[in-house]
Amino acid sequence: MPYFGICVLFLTVIEGEKREEKDMFEKVNAIVELVNGKVWGWGMIVLLFGTHIFLTIRTGFIQKASITKGIKLSVTKDEGAEGEVSQFGALTTALASTIGTGNIIGVGTAVAMGGPGAVLWCWLTGVFGIATKYAESLIAVKYRVKTKDGRMQGGAMYALERGLNMRWLGVIFAVLAGFASFGIGCATQVNAIATVCQENLGIPPWIVGIVIAVLTAVVIFGGIKSIANVCEKLVPFMAIFYVLGCLIILGINYDFIIPAIVTICKLAFTPGAAAGGLVGGGLRLAIQYGVARGLFSNESGMGSAPIAAAAAQTRNPVRQALVSSTGTFWDTVVVCLMTGLVLVTTIMKNPAINADEIANGGVLTSMAFAQIPYIGPVILVVGIISFAFSTVLGWAYYGERCVEYFAGKKGLVPYRVLYVVVAAIAPVVSLNLVWLIADTLNALMAIPNLIAVLLLSPIVVKETKKYINNLDAVDDTPVPVVETGHGQRKAKG
């Protein structure tokens, strides 16, 4: 299995720390940082943001329908339609993977590294990213397949294979997404849980790793229905709980909200310093970290959420695409924006905060929530634990579908075991290195998906025109039946 390499990487880092081989570790970190800088250069930023804008125009600003129709559809059920889980179950599974530490620590890191201006770029990535999430979800449902045992499978790999006859690129996407699941989906999340538990509850990281690993194993060995059942209950609770905490802080920092908005908008387009301890990271860094953390947060363009969308019971592709696109609205347009405002208002309110504290996204977030008497730290701890654990579950499902695509069902058990192992060892791995690796893999897996979305945009437009004003219409196109997750090669009928 190619995933053995990711485990070896983490074990190597751990062993290096134990032996105090700091030089080797620093070299590895420097190499990963260099690669990350190249991958997240202007080319990737233009490709991602350009795709968002292109699809916004091609779909006639689908964001309006996403908010007005998609939110309403997300709580309805298409019980007579084909699929494994409800539309709401598919949405919450996708939200479980997107509303994670990227919304809390990730935004803090963006502000720390890119300055306050990164918040606006993160938000804009979400606004325009709604169109991309819509398009990638539409083609995922359009080109999904059904296994002999009745499971629905879809995603960028199937769209590339069945829609563009590019199975080779579908395999590349599946492999990269499988690797990415260990980073964005597992290691970063468990590491964040371990950090907050150690700092606030005094629990040793290795104990946290074992507990999370056991809980993860119990759920993921139950399949998509088990994951969806947990997410349907967990996601609404954690989102409301966290948003209420943010609203309380913004109420405390009321006088600094308008100045914070002005500062964010100003530094998003011009380099320079701001008042109150804030440092402008420069235009390039503001855009780079804003867009990168926006992708980490909402995953629009990565091709991950459509894997869950493909399993939904839905009458037609447009119906589920609208539901899935609302995930980006809730994740980035609402949650990330509120986090950004909380952080920037906190820094402006406390100009004595030193540069080292601002440079640490996690510490910065902790300071912001500490403003709420007594329960502030509790809200942050509960928020990070619930957000992160739900992400671990959602990405486990994504990884499984990708592994099954290129390796068949025989690869599922080894993948699950390795996923649990990574969860167990993640708390003792360098957080900075883990985030760098995750960022790099996110960009790499996004490239094949963006190619699929752009080349299949005529199909997206055609399907949108067909169903957008007739959402109750049923798409009676037969779904191909496959023997395994190997796509069209073994399709029947």
Tell what function each PLM region has.
Residues 3-4, 9-10, 17, 24-101, ...:
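N-terminal alpha-helical transmembrane segments of multi-pass membrane transport
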Residues 25-28, 59-63, 102-107, 183-194, ...:
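Transmembrane helix-loop junctions in multi-pass membrane proteins
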Residues 45-50, 86-94, 166-180, 210-211, ...:
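Select transmembrane alpha-helical segments in multipass membrane proteins
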Residues 47-54, 58-71, 191-197, 204-265, ...:
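Membrane-interface loop-to-helix entry segments
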Residues 51, 55-56, 125-150, 156-191, ...:
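Helix-loop-helix module between adjacent transmembrane segments
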Residues 61-87, 109-111, 115-119, 123, ...:
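Flexible loop linkers connecting adjacent transmembrane helices
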Residues 80-113, 139-157, 161-162, 175-178, ...:
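Alpha-helical membrane segments and immediately flanking helix-loop junctions
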Residues 136-143, 247-263, 271, 275-278, ...:
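Extracellular/periplasmic helix-exit of transmembrane alpha-helices
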